[in-house]
């Protein structure tokens, strides 16, 4: 990544709703209340997902929790009822209802407001450095507002989110 503009001193993020141990560089974030920022949770499918499947195998490193809604550019959000992290290769997210469309391997997924394709958090920046997530309290990290990102070296970010990241160029 090539940074052109960042937020000096970084940003403060809520950490209590994050389901992973690390916040990875390139994760989209958006502004919440009182100057605090929130993570727009993202993931990628580990395998092809059948249209009738309620189980999503996703890459490790996501922050989804039971109760979150997860969507894709081609699929409305569905509620996650459980998260199974037993496998060393992938996690299994069990949905209340299937997506009803086939999702190819490496499909970018994101947190939605509900049964729609509206991002739960409207992203305006990307996390500047990977950071350990504390179990309680707040998390401080750098944030890139204007940057150039090599897609092959970054986390999978859905087109729905990219449309909000107007000052981030994906090459």
What is each stretch, according to the model?
Residues 1-171:
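Surface-exposed, low-hydrophobicity beta-strand/loop segments enriched in small/polar/acidic residues
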């Amino acid at each position: 990544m090539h940074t052109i503009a960042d937020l000096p001193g970084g940003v403060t993020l809520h950490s209590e709703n994050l389901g992973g141990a690390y916040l990875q560089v390139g994760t989209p974030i958006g502004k919440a209340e009182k100057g605090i920022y929130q993570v727009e949770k993202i993931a990628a499918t580990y395998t092809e997902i059948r249209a009738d499947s309620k189980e999503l195998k996703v890459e490790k490193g996501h922050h989804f929790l039971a109760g979150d809604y997860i969507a894709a550019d081609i699929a409305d959000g569905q509620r996650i009822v459980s998260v199974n992290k037993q496998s060393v290769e992938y996690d299994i997210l069990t949905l209340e209802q299937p997506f009803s469309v086939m999702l190819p391997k490496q499909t970018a997924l994101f947190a939605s407001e509900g049964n729609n394709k509206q991002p739960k958090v409207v992203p305006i920046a990307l996390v500047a450095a990977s950071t350990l997530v504390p179990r309680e309290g707040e998390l401080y990290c750098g944030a890139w507002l204007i940057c150039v990102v090599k897609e092959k070296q970054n986390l999978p970010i859905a087109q729905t989110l990219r449309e909000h990241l107007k000052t981030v160029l994906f090459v």
